[in-house]
Amino acid sequence: MEKTVLLILQSHRKDTAVSVQKVLTAWGCLIKTRLGIHDGVLDNCSESGLIILELVGDKEKHNEMARKLDLIDGVTTELVTLSI
């Protein structure tokens, strides 16, 4: 069994959120699970955040989605494949 996970780190969430969401929406059929993590609550939201995606489908498309996200200033990605 093999699982592919895309880690997305945003350093300026308020500036990057809309652009990141557009990419994720465009590639939505590849996303099986999405988890967003950031520090803060209510009016004290943090400027950085982590999104963890479990991906399905073609690896070339995974790489392309990661590349498009990496083009956004303040966003860094890491594509991880785990197998057992």
Q: Where does each model-flagged region fall?
A:
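Long, contiguous binding/interaction regions
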Residues: 1-84
